[in-house]
Each structure stands twice: as C-alpha cells, then as structure tokens.
Amino acid sequence: MAEKPHMNLVVIGHVDHGKSTLVGHLLYRLGYIEEKKLKELEEQAKSRGKESFKFAWILDKMKEERERGITIDLTFMKFETKKYVFTIIDAPGHRDFVKNMITGASQADAAILVVSARKGEFEAGMSTEGQTREHLLLARTMGIEQIIVAVNKMDAPDVNYDQKRYEFVVSVLKKFMKGLGYQVDKIPFIPVSAWKGDNLIERSPNMPWYNGPTLVEALDQLQPPAKPVDKPLRIPVQNVYSIPGAGTVPVGRVETGVLRVGDKVVFMPPGVVGEVRSIEMHYQQLQQAEPGDNIGFAVRGVSKSDIKRGDVAGHLDKPPTVAEEFEARIFVIWHPSAITVGYTPVIHVHTASVSSRIIEIKAKLDPKTGQVVEQNPQFLKAGDAAIVRFKPVKPLVVEKFSEIPQLGRFAMRDMNRTVGIGIVTDVKPAKVDIKAK
C-alpha cells in the first residue's frame, strides 16, 4: 500500500464563525473521537451552560491534554481521508491567533476558510476590522494558493438553509478574493452546518439546491504540494524541547531540501552546529525528512538554550542567510497615519518575529502593475505599495522570495494589527561566526 501524501491544513476565519466546531465535528465524524469521550465532553459543556460548544470543546480538551505532556506539535490534529493524511496546523481559537496564523499559514499547503452566513456575523468578518478579510490577506501573502470556503451556520434560524443568503455571501467573498488574485472559479464554496454536520461528509438533504462537493470531497480534490527537495535545506524552528534520552529536540517543518540522520546542521542566526541523531514524525522514526514534513529531530552538540523559535536549520555548505539588511516589496494594509523612514514594525517571517526598522523608502509602486510611480517618497499610507529597505533590530534569517519563497514572505504587525505584507527582493548578509564543534 503506497503511503498517502501528507498535507498541512490551516483553518482560518473570524472569531466565533465556527472554526473549532467544524474541526471537532469533522474529527468526530471521521471516527477520531470515541462516543464515550464525546458524551463526557457534552456533559461537561452542558454543566457549564455551553452545550453548543461540545465539538469546540473536543479541540480545547485535546489542546489541554497536549500541553500537559510533551507531544511533539499537533499530533492529535491528524486525520486521514481517502487520498491524504492531513495535519491541522494550529487548532484555532488562540488569543494570539493572527501571530500563529502567520507562522502557521507559512507552513500550510491549503486552508479552510470558515465564514458564518448569519446576518451581522458575516458582515462583521468582512468589515475593515474583520478577521475574514485579514486572514484571507495573510493566507495570500503566505503563498496559500488552495482554499476551501465553508459557508457555515446554514442551520441557524435566521439563515434556515436559504440559497439566496448563501449566494449573497459567496458573491461578496468572490469579489474580495478575486481582488487578492485568487482564481475564484476553482475554489469550492460549501454551505455547511458545523454544528449539525450538514455537507461535512454526507450530502445534506436540507440543501438540495447545492450540488458541489462535501467538505471531505473537497479536501480530496486538493492538489498535492510540490516538494522542493533540490533546494538548500531550511527548517524554521517552531519549538525546542529537551527530552530525556534524546537530548535537544528542535521541532519544525522542513520547508526545502532533505534532512537525513547523521547530517551536520547549523542553526542560524546563532551559528551553532549539531549532528542529527534521529528524526521523528507523528511518533514514527524516519531516516530522512522532506519538504512538508513536520518533524522533531534530536541534535548532538547543541543545548536547548542555544536555539529558539525563529532560528533556521540548514546544512553547513549552504547555511541559512542572516540579514544585516533586506530589501522588500511591501503593501500597506492599514496604518492610522503615515509610515516614514524610522518606522519599526514587527516582521513575522516563517516562525520568527523580529522588529525591523525601515531605513529607506526607495520607491512607491502602482499596486496593480508594480510600476514605479514615485522615487523616494516621504511617506506611505494604507493602500500604498512600495520598495523599502529594512534593518532587523536583532539577527534574523530571511531569504530572497525568488530563491526560497517560504522564507521570503512576511507580514508587518504593529498595535496588534497587520500593517502590511511583503516579499523579500534582496538580502545584504550579516557576518556570522559558525561555531563548529
């Protein structure tokens, strides 16, 4: 039996639109949660007056259980369909969700966007403050080409499986997504009830007017991601554990290249070198790991305090690039006034987040064509596109988008909001001493 290809899935959408309920119910329907466990959770939810949250509780309980032991990242959120093995990155519902959404999205092969069809809720998600808009923008920046849209809460009394409301929601989303450059004709918009289960796995008798795929069918229609095995090895570190018997175990997703047991790897920016003793994915030992694999790998010669989230592992002959400065094409999404030289947002790139100062605004661009419309403008405001130079305040690994896109796209955050998005066009490398032992 050939092994099923692996896909990383991120679930996005506005708060309370049903992300956790959708994932919890899907896992239950696919047989990943025992009836007994569900009953137990239902009782707990009822006793706290939160009966409608029972499926969401599945995720929260799993998260708590996960946080009690060292389960190497997100093992519980794994499920299989006929065609794929899916890992759900970052179960939704985080206070810090956008930050996680950025690092999570940078590792995702596809996304499910959950959108409530309810009047008021849908509109809130699409408002300028809305996370439906923000998450779609971020998914686009982070290079997620494949999206499935779940139009949720079709069972709500004020929606009542109404085809017209579904069509209205879809038309608004299509217009917005088209503006972001998505090929909307290739995107499934599935009317679902995460709570009742309509169109998750079986076709819903409540919506005979819909003849597209169910959620699970749409998941199986996704295209497998291309594996950039020929590029230099890059593994952005998500977490670092110290595990008895194994030693220091960084966890992350292989973005490019191949990691093998016995390889010497260097972690940048710190420049520490270690030897790979073992590689593990979903509790299974591997001899090698390829792009898309979420792994833990034990390294000899590196202590837990040497490395942290945001560092990047690579091979010694082609180490990850630490930027003294970098040039980028950015698009300003939101800012209360104007962005000038000296502005210092937090740059979220792969798993790193580092404040970086704008040291030059080289040119303002036409956002649609990319043509230069003004050299050395004094300031930038919302809606502007530009070429700027950044200087990271602390050491930071970035790569040219044209060479390693996974490490070359970023979001700019400030005041708890996404201020802009960008791609790295050039890097002035910093000198780093590699501390080979």
From Swiss-Prot:
Cytoplasm as UniProt keyword: yes
Function as written in the Swiss-Prot or TrEMBL entry: GTP hydrolase that promotes the GTP-dependent binding of aminoacyl-tRNA to the A-site of ribosomes during protein biosynthesis.
UniProt catalytic activity: GTP + H2O = GDP + phosphate + H(+)
A Pfam entry, by short name: GTP-eEF1A_C
Source organism phylogeny: Archaea, Thermoproteota, Thermoprotei, Desulfurococcales, Desulfurococcaceae
Family statement: Belongs to the TRAFAC class translation factor GTPase superfamily. Classic translation factor GTPase family. EF-Tu/EF-1A subfamily.
Residue ranges, annotated region (G1): 13-20
Region: G5, residue numbers: 193-195
Start and end residues of each stretch annotated as G2: 69-73
EC number: 3.6.5.3
Protein name: Elongation factor 1-alpha
GO CC terms: cytoplasm
Record flagged with keyword Nucleotide-binding: yes
